[in-house]
Amino acid sequence: MALCLIVTRPAAQAADWVRQLSALGLQAEALPLLGIEAVADQAPLLAAWQDLTACKLVVFVSPNAVQHFFAAAPSFAPNPPATWPSAVLAGSTGPGTTQALRQAGVPAAQIAEPAAEAAQFDTEALWSRLQAMAWTAERVLVVRGESGRDWLADVLRQQGAEVNFVAAYRRTPPQPDAAGLALLAAASSQPAQHLWLFSSSEAVACLHALAPAADWSRSRALASHPRIVQAARDLGFGQVQITAPTVQAVTQAAVRLGSPGPGADASGQAPGQARGPEGPSIQLLDL
C-alpha cells in the first residue's frame, strides 16, 4: 500500500497542499488539526489599516495573518496591489507567508524574509535580515493570532522600536468530519502506511486532544521546525524528521520514507538508526 501523507494545516491551506502534493504523485489527504477564523472584533484591524503608513515594518507571522489582515482592509481602500504603502516593509517568516503577501499585492521589493537557504523559517531567521537596519523610535506592527511568541517584539524593543500587536485571527479546536475521524483511526491502527505532516506545535497538541489514548510510538512524522519536532517527540512519535516547509522538500522527504533502503526493517527504519532510551529519533534532511 502506498504511503499516505496526512496534511494537518488549517482546512484551506491543507486542501491546497493536498492538491500540490497529489500533482507531484504523492497520496495525500487532509486532516486539519486547527481551525482558523476571523476575530470577532474587527475594530483594531481597521485602526491598524488607518495607521499603516506610520509603521516602518509590519510583520506577518503566517499566511493566515496575511489573509485575515487583508480581508479586513477598510472599504475606502482600493483593491490590491494599491493598498500597500510604498514606504512600509512587510516582514515574512517563511515562503508560505511570502507567497500570501505577493498574492495580496505587496511588491516583492518591500518584503523582508529569511534567506532561502535559512536553516529554518521563523522570526529568528527574519531578524537576521532586519538587524542591520536602524530601529530607534521606529514603529512596528506584528500581525498574528490571538496569542503567539514575543521574541521578535522583545528584540526590536531592545533596539529602540515601538512594537504593537494586532490579532487578525483566532485558532479554534479541530472538528473533523466522518472522513477525518476515519483517517485518524486508520493512521493510529496502521502507522506503517501513514506519514504525518505537522506545521505547528498547536496541531500536535490538538492531535493529542482528539486521540488522548493513542500510541504513536510506531508512527512517523515530518515537521517544519525544531519546536514542532520536539512537540511530536513529546507526544510519543517514534520517528520524526525535519524538513523545509515547501511542497518540494516535503515530497522528497515523503518519497524517502516511502522507499526504504536495503536492509531497512518493516517500519522503514534502517540499521543504525536506533531510537534508544533518550527518545524517538530525529534525522535532519539534507534537502
Segment roles from a protein language model:
Residues 1-268, 276-287:
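Conserved beta-alpha
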